């Protein structure tokens, strides 16, 4: 699916080619979401990555999740050749380090993620109205706090759970900023997003 979506970055993807890759009931919702919100690829973060690399040292790079001292050295040697996120990740790839791992490390760098927090909460992004009783039961039985409204999280979470939530929110805001600039659509803060009800 990713190859079909991003095979030609200068042309809108042919969404109908993806219809056979997903359940029939999902395709209309997918099509609506892409039309309304656009698509982002890792290359949409290229300028931000290039700017961020200018301020990093070997020590600071090594402090990010998944970023080893060896990868930090390679990044520093090649950082001025960062023409795009995906091309830079390919340049950094070795037999020992996959493109996927490097991409993940570069995203951790962009998002300033240095700590991997344990799962400390569950967050509901949407549900069917008919499943209200099930949601209530999950909330009652869950050992983790259940977040249905992002703005309530600081009141419901503490410690690592709150830190993990804040890290997730920061990543969402980062994504939303890039999406908003790329598509020319209004920025929507994570705390104001509505729960999706079907």
Feature roles, as predicted:
Residues 2-198:
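Active-site cores that bind ATP or allylic diphosphates and position pyrophosphate for catalysis
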């Amino acid at each position: 699916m990713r190859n079909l979506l991003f095979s030609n970055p200068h042309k809108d993807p042919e969404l109908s080619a993806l219809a056979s890759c997903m359940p029939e009931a999902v395709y209309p919702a997918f099509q609506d979401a892409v039309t309304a919100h656009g698509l982002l690829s890792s290359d949409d973060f290229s300028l931000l990555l290039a700017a961020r690399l200018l301020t990093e040292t070997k020590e600071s790079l090594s402090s990010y999740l998944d970023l080893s001292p060896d990868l930090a050295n390679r990044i520093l040697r090649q950082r001025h050749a960062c023409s795009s996120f995906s091309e830079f990740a390919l340049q950094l790839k070795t037999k020992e380090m996959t493109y996927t791992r490097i991409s993940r490390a570069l995203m951790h760098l962009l998002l300033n993620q240095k700590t991997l927090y344990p799962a400390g909460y569950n967050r509901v992004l949407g549900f069917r109205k008919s499943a209200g009783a099930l949601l209530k039961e999950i909330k009652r039985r869950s050992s983790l706090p259940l977040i249905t409204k992002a703005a309530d999280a600081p009141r419901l979470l503490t410690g690592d759970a709150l830190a993990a939530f804040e890290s997730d929110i920061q990543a969402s805001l980062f994504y939303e900023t890039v999406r908003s600039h790329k598509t020319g659509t209004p920025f929507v803060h994570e705390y104001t997003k509505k729960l999706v009800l079907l």
